Amino acid sequence: MSKSLRVGVVGAGAMGADHIDRINNRTSGAHISAIIEPDAARAAAAAEDAPGAQAFTRIEDAIAADAVDAVLIAVPGQFHEPVLVPALEAGLPILCEKPLTPDSESSLRIVELEQKLDKPHIQVGFMRRFDPEYNNLRKLVESGEAGELLMLRGLHRNPSVGESYTQSMLITDSVVHEFDVIPWLAGSRVVSVEVKYPKTSSLAHSGLKEPILVIMELENGVLVDVEMNVNIQFGYQVATEAVFEKGLARIGQPSGMQRWRDGEFLINEHTDFTTRFATAYDRQIQSWVDAVHEGTLVAGPNAWDGYLVALSCEAGVKALDGGVIPVDAAPRPDFYA
């Protein structure tokens, strides 16, 4: 494919609008050809950054009009399956924001439907795999330079969350990212999940018990703990420490200007994910567009990865009530090898 890839974005909320801007202004080889959004006001606002894009209220209408070569799904997770199905049936390449679907049962349906095609068509938007620091850490793991990987420690901290943020969202909206990137870093899937509760923050709203410590065991024996804290106040921080046989490595440390003033040491920290993972988002989209042009269609997490994450999230939600919860998964199909 030598022409510019015509991308239809499904969903014109904050994430969809961000992707529209990214594709039209920072991505080569693609442009927004269609905005699929039932809310007229949102669609009109998004269209300001996508001159010439056609407006549709349903993905089926955009497909019937031959308005798209590929689809980017940016609606909430509960609406993913109704968009994925017609897009797959039309044989379109898809980048689907996380999660693939909200549960393993529906994710498995998508996996089974996709296997009727000649190759994987779905890339799931777990953007951390495209972060330069995560890539450097994975290369270190794979090289064996520091010996075997023994343990991973993760920090996932948000300044605050709204009243609508529920207990289960600690897993399904936040730790969901660790359930993808940790197996990718360590080269082994999650086989069990446990949740521990430290002292509850007085800043957590009524009904929310946090922070939590999520403990994962991987199939290769690596143990992982992740601090999930959504009311840390000072900023947004995602960091990982890897413990090897011959040393350790850390990523996600504060960066930028360092200042010493009035007996204090000051350094900048991110305030949200849009700056912490700005490069990752850009690389994710560009890699996907390049893969579609090359005919490989997928350049990152695939639908099977999305299914495994759904299984891990279900175990994590159960673990909020106590116990070590197993994550049982069938072997990866050759289709996704």
Curated annotation (Swiss-Prot):
Phosphoprotein listed as a keyword: no
UniProt superkingdom: Bacteria
Chemical reaction(s) catalysed: myo-inositol + NAD(+) = scyllo-inosose + NADH + H(+)
Gene3D superfamilies the record matches: Dihydrodipicolinate Reductase, domain 2, NAD(P)-binding Rossmann-like Domain
Pfam families: GFO_IDH_MocA, GFO_IDH_MocA_C3
EC number(s) recorded for this UniProt protein: 1.1.1.18
MF GO annotations: inositol 2-dehydrogenase (NAD+) activity; nucleotide binding
Keywords: NAD, Oxidoreductase
One biological process term in Gene Ontology: inositol catabolic process
Classification via InterPro entries: Gfo-Idh-MocA_inositol_DH, Gfo/Idh/MocA-like_OxRdtase_N, GFO_IDH_MocA-like_dom, MI/DCI_dehydrogenase, NAD(P)-bd_dom_sf
Subunit-level organization: Homotetramer.
Sequence similarity: Belongs to the Gfo/Idh/MocA family.
Stated role: Involved in the oxidation of myo-inositol (MI) to 2-keto-myo-inositol (2KMI or 2-inosose).
Protein name (database record): Inositol 2-dehydrogenase
